[in-house]
């Protein structure tokens, strides 16, 4: 995979940057989804028909018209059909630029963010800005399904290898939800670790859980963005397991006040945003 594209070379990610305190929409940086989809052969037609990159933004603050600081938490849904994904460090810098800028009210901030993200992503984006009090009653959730992590197996390789999924199914037709907390990959630019919980919901021939776990662990030294990893997992499962229906959903731990939770499916609606124990 060759990601040495001009759109990546210009990213602020991995570079020393200054933090702006006045609103600046030009801080947002796009990454074309085609960079990864070309290699997967899905640039024109994706095997998933429903999906979004679901972001939670915890560090949002601005000034009201009297200069009093305000804070909020945002849920952001970035449609999978957008031309670009949003590079996470640029998003953090963009959010920080609100800190010393005055806005009339919550709605003005929400509309500003939604407009700017739509322009950067070149696709549909939904932003919901919530007062902190909304989260007072929020529970720590868990993703329903059988956890595949407690298997007594020996692992000797941590290099990505989709071939772990070869011959991974039996003839038994099932509907299953499987969960692994062992998803770990590395940032494409900085090599920093990205920690996630993976949820797979499928209908089709039963998937061998040992083969699936070995495949998940093989991402451990793999360098890709969160969104790209989830699309790769979806494509690999469709290729090797050939399920009738499939959802792949990953919830990653927070970095820089942001968590990214890509969801791709060919049969399920988008989930409500939630929070897992590690988030």
From Swiss-Prot:
InterPro entries reported for this sequence: GTP-CH-I_C/QueF, NADPH_dep_7-cyano-7-deazaG_red, QueF, QueF_N, QueF_type2
GO terms, biological process: queuosine biosynthetic process; tRNA modification
Subcellular location: Cytoplasm
Recorded coiled-coil stretches: none
GO cellular component, one term: cytoplasm
Keyword Nuclease: no
Residues reported to bind NADPH: 88-89, 255-256
Record: active site: 187, 194
Keywords linked to the UniProt accession: Cytoplasm, NADP, Oxidoreductase, Queuosine biosynthesis
UniProt pathway: tRNA modification; tRNA-queuosine biosynthesis
Residue numbers binding substrate: 86-88, 226-227
MF term (GO), any: preQ1 synthase activity
EC number(s) on file: 1.7.1.13
Reactions it catalyzes: 7-aminomethyl-7-carbaguanine + 2 NADP(+) = 7-cyano-7-deazaguanine + 2 NADPH + 3 H(+)
Keyword match tRNA-binding: no
Entry-linked Pfam families: QueF, QueF_N
Gene3D superfamilies: 3.30.1130.10
Known function: Catalyzes the NADPH-dependent reduction of 7-cyano-7-deazaguanine (preQ0) to 7-aminomethyl-7-deazaguanine (preQ1).
Subunit structure: Homodimer.
Family per record: Belongs to the GTP cyclohydrolase I family. QueF type 2 subfamily.
Protein known as: NADPH-dependent 7-cyano-7-deazaguanine reductase
Record organism: Haemophilus influenzae (strain PittEE)
Origin organism lineage: Bacteria, Pseudomonadati, Pseudomonadota, Gammaproteobacteria, Pasteurellales
């Amino acid at each position: 995979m060759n990601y040495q594209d001009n759109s990546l070379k210009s990213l602020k990610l991995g570079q020393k940057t200054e933090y702006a305190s006045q609103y600046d929409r030009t801080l947002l940086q796009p990454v074309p989804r085609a960079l990864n989809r070309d290699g997967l052969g899905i640039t024109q037609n994706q095997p998933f028909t429903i999906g979004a990159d679901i972001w939670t933004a915890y560090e949002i603050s601005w000034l009201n018209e009297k200069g009093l600081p305000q804070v909020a938490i945002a849920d952001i849904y970035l449609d999978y059909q957008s031309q670009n994904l949003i590079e996470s460090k640029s998003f953090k810098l963009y959010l920080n630029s609100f800190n010393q800028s005055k806005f009339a009210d919550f709605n003005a901030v929400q509309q500003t963010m939604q407009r700017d993200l739509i322009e950067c992503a070149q696709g549909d984006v939904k932003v919901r800005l919530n007062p902190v009090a909304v989260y007072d009653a929020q529970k720590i959730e868990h993703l329903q399904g059988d956890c595949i992590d407690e298997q007594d197996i020996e692992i000797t390789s941590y290099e990505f290898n989709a071939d772990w999924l070869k011959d991974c199914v039996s003839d038994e037709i099932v509907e299953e939800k499987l969960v692994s907390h062992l998803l770990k990959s590395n940032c494409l630019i900085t090599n920093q670790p990205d920690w996630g919980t993976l949820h797979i919901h499928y209908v089709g021939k039963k998937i061998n859980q040992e083969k699936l776990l070995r495949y998940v662990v093989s991402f451990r030294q793999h360098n890709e963005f969160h969104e790209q990893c989830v699309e790769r997992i979806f494509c690999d499962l469709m290729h090797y397991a050939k399920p009738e229906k499939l959802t792949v959903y990953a919830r990653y731990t927070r970095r820089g006040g942001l968590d990214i939770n890509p969801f791709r499916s060919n049969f399920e609606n988008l989930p409500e945003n939630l929070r897992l124990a590690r988030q």
